């Protein structure tokens, strides 16, 4: 494995640089990365501290810094060390300015912008928490997305991930031989997505969960036939109503959420035409 050091430097949380780095690293299976996070770098004193760390451990520098003087100092330093220094969104900002004819604002305001998007995200997170695991079914019509699936198919973390993207997601577990909420018999506008998983993989996850909780008596929870029937029944429910089904066996939460968002926005764009 080839070791690769990456310094993420930002005047905010470094999340943009981090996501970009991880997306790029996914293309290199033989690389063993070491990421150093340097958030909230907003003055020369803090930047100089980071520069000393970079000098000690050479590596690629990815940055998102708005202040022009700090950017110049960082790029000049890296140039002298002969190490790559890449602005994550600099090219995007420049192209936006050229295309729109609007000059880039020189002054950076570090006060967070509490706009509609911010409050929509907060509301979506609150909604996901209150409507987790089949709670408050009387408010399902407020949801953007409803997830259904057997227990431990990543419904909760997927709901939260969707919430961080401003989408209200409720999730409802399907349990074998238990009545499902009557909302499935109604013609609803919300996007309903079924989550299923390979039964053997689901049993592994459930067994690990039971061991963590030190529970040894719930045999039906890990019974192959029951687990298989739960997944098949969810598929059947969704197929009968033309609801999409996603197999999460080999997907990360981010991938599952991205697929759901693609379905949601394709559907929304279609209805808005």
Swiss-Prot record:
It comes from the Bacteria. Disulfide bonds: none annotated. GO terms for molecular function: ADP binding; ATP binding; phosphotransferase activity, phosphate group as acceptor; protein serine/threonine kinase activity. ADP binds at residues 149-156. Pfam families: Kinase-PPPase. Keywords: Kinase, Nucleotide-binding, Serine/threonine-protein kinase, Transferase. Its EC number is 2.7.11.32, 2.7.4.27. It catalyses: N(tele)-phospho-L-histidyl/L-threonyl-[pyruvate, phosphate dikinase] + ADP = N(tele)-phospho-L-histidyl/O-phospho-L-threonyl-[pyruvate, phosphate dikinase] + AMP + H(+); N(tele)-phospho-L-histidyl/O-phospho-L-threonyl-[pyruvate, phosphate dikinase] + phosphate + H(+) = N(tele)-phospho-L-histidyl/L-threonyl-[pyruvate, phosphate dikinase] + diphosphate. Belongs to the pyruvate, phosphate/water dikinase regulatory protein family. PDRP subfamily. Bifunctional serine/threonine kinase and phosphorylase involved in the regulation of the pyruvate, phosphate dikinase (PPDK) by catalyzing its phosphorylation/dephosphorylation. This is Putative pyruvate, phosphate dikinase regulatory protein. It comes from Rickettsia africae (strain ESF-5).
